[in-house]
Amino acid sequence: MQIFVKTLTGKTITLEVEPSDTIENVKAKIQDKEGIPPDQQRLIFAGKQLEDGRTLSDYNIQKESTLHLVLRLRGGMQIFVKTLTGKTITLEVEPSDTIENVKAKIQDKEGIPPDQQRLIFAGKQLEDGRTLSDYNIQKESTLHLVLRLRGGMQIFVKTLTGKTITLEVEPSDTIENVKAKIQDKEGIPPDQQRLIFAGKQLEDGRTLSDYNIQKESTLHLVLRLRGGMQIFVKTLTGKTITLEVEPSDTIENVKAKIQDKEGIPPDQQRLIFAGKQLEDGRTLSDYNIQKESTLHLVLRLRGGMQIFVKTLTGKTITLEVEPSDTIENVKAKIQDKEGIPPDQQRLIFAGKQLEDGRTLSDYNIQKESTLHLVLRLRGGMQIFVKTLTGKTITLEVEPSDTIENVKAKIQDKEGIPPDQQRLIFAGKQLEDGRTLSDYNIQKESTLHLVLRLRGGMQIFVKTLTGKTITLEVEPSDTIENVKAKIQDKEGIPPDQQRLIFAGKQLEDGRTLSDYNIQKESTLHLVLRLRGGMQIFVKTLTGKTITLEVEPSDTIENVKAKIQDKQGIPPDQQRLIFAGKQLEDGRTLSDYNIQKESTLHLVLRLRGGMQIFVKTLTGKTITLEVEPSNTIKKSKQEDGRTFLTTLSRKSTPCACSWA
């Protein structure tokens, strides 16, 4: 079959080939026709560079298809592609590569289809048919990759003159790109544009979606109309650079001006003013930098990085640092940001306290690592940790130490990994992020160490409303801990919770395993609605039992209390109040049983039954009885006493009312 090969000069070569020809074969045919060595040829089809060992049919190249021939005129080069997630991709390219070809390389590396890619350089979107050299993209240049996540949308840009410009954009467009579109429409250079949305100046490197700018949103365009000012930048070598700037210039923009003058890439620059490192997205006016102010330029010798410092309040501080920074330096940066004196700071990483004279690289602290900041509130103290084997460990701690830090100290002493440790104090499991002082743990307090020997399990907690809560627990969890989990899920304070299992109320200091509570067991949750009260239970033998109960106790729970006191199994108990048999699932308050009320306990000896008693007035009374009931036994119904004096003799019965 015939195929065509088009060169960058516009010349078209016709080749006779077969679908089974390799790309290497095709290059040999081009060499025969044009004299171009195969190692200087790169063939492109459908935006992809063709590999020598593959065949035409592998790429679905059919008769009269057109390949594009790109010559390796100058050696290759590396460029970088930065995504919105911050990931940087390195690509091997040539100046003659088309943008389409670059997108194909990105697809090969990242799997992103070319039609979902938009490449930005110097604030401009790159067109598929153009080459890298067309855009003056040189070695080690950085392109920005924006994904076409959703279809385009319209936004409006309103100028101070009242004119409104309509732009076609995508949520993933950068502000820099929007300014380029405004330049295309209005001829205003991007560096003279400031875009405002919701009262904020928009930063070039951010996207419309970062600012939640949606379709038909209106941005405000402010021009940099007033004249600039001079500032000075002093380097560590003592050299002073003079820059023409405006108060609205971003730090990023100032760094670009320094690059223009001195050739120092922005990512190697750190600018300091009034002891603070300046952040790229902020403006000179944000830092109150005025005319003839002097900034200090510090170079990132081995490439800076960002780390995070998390305080005990949960606040996270972002710091710009270098691997060679000492811990002392880092504390100084924290002081600049938060005002905390270095001697009150303790920095923790991977469970270890960091020493002032050491560097971040000494501790293998890398970009985006998180340090924990603990304040030295008071001097140190000793606490004890008791294991289940009876061994007692002595630890030197401070009230401001986190539980995580205590676990790290235990690991140092005993070799037990922190994730296998559970620390208990006053019946509560201690949470990693909290401090000893949060739990009022003082000098010479004793913590209990429980090992996570087996994985967790699920249990269920059923409320009186019928709702079932699922909890992830461990057999060694205390009841207090389970109540804390219920509070997390349902918001019920632990002191209002009573947990029942197998008819018993569970005590806070005991564990689930103490009660033989296993996976998928169901506990019953009873709320302490009002304070407790005393009631009486009268048996048929005349004995009276006193019980401590709450109005929210279920009848089932009352029976459990009777079992605890008298040893009578709940299924043999029948409780009567105001002539009614009480149902297990109902509460005392359901029956209006109040303090010092008396219930009657009837035993189910051989299974109960119902009988009917018909009065002379025609009324029928239903009674719950047992075959063992005597005829002379008195029963209460509707507040009256029904006395039967039926004789077991063969004579007709005589009935009387009292």
Curated annotation (Swiss-Prot):
Domain of life: Eukaryota
Site of covalent link Glycyl lysine isopeptide (Lys-Gly) (interchain with G-Cter in ubiquitin): K6, K11, K27, K29, K33, K48, K63
Signal peptide: none
GO CC terms of this entry: cytoplasm; nucleus
Placement of covalent cross-link Glycyl lysine isopeptide (Gly-Lys) (interchain with K-? in acceptor proteins): G76
Site residues, Essential for function: H68
Note: For the sake of clarity sequence features are annotated only for the first chain, and are not repeated for each of the following chains.
Protein name in the entry: Polyubiquitin
Native source organism of the sequence: Cricetulus griseus (Chinese hamster)
